[in-house]
């Protein structure tokens, strides 16, 4: 992912303000509610029968936290996202058979939730930087599929 120094500074500054655990839980929960076909990968999480069930599900929250910590690791390795996410790409492709389009959808949910979480600090320029990163992460996660 090619980012300017200003974009890198914006990412770093804003990421420090975000509540990563809550953002991860909210982003994954929204993915499962807005795109219900993604729930098939999480049937073992228990009750996903309604928006409130999904958003209150402790397994969804825990996995969202895990996802966001992986994303945070990617922020530390922006010059090598494919390498950073190679094991997760292989897992999601070979074992879990996740449609790689879901990575893009989750990235969009992440940007949406960050926008809400960070409020006015999440400027259009900051959004553009985060969109670049989530697109890069989605591409890295889909790498094994090609």
From Swiss-Prot:
Protein name per UniProt: Hemoglobin subunit beta
Domain Globin: 2-146
Tissue: Red blood cells.
Residues recorded with modification N-acetylvaline: 1
MF terms in GO: haptoglobin binding; heme binding; hemoglobin alpha binding; metal ion binding; organic acid binding; oxygen binding; oxygen carrier activity; peroxidase activity
Pfam families: Globin
Residues carrying N6-acetyllysine: 59, 82, 144
Chain sites annotated for binding heme b: 63, 92
S-nitrosocysteine modified-residue sites: 93
The keyword DNA-binding appears for this protein: no
GO biological process assignments: hydrogen peroxide catabolic process
Record's keyword terms, sorted: Acetylation, Heme, Iron, Metal-binding, Oxygen transport, S-nitrosylation, Transport
Family: Belongs to the globin family.
Keyword Lipid biosynthesis assigned: no
Provenance organism: Microtus pennsylvanicus
Coiled-coil residue spans: none
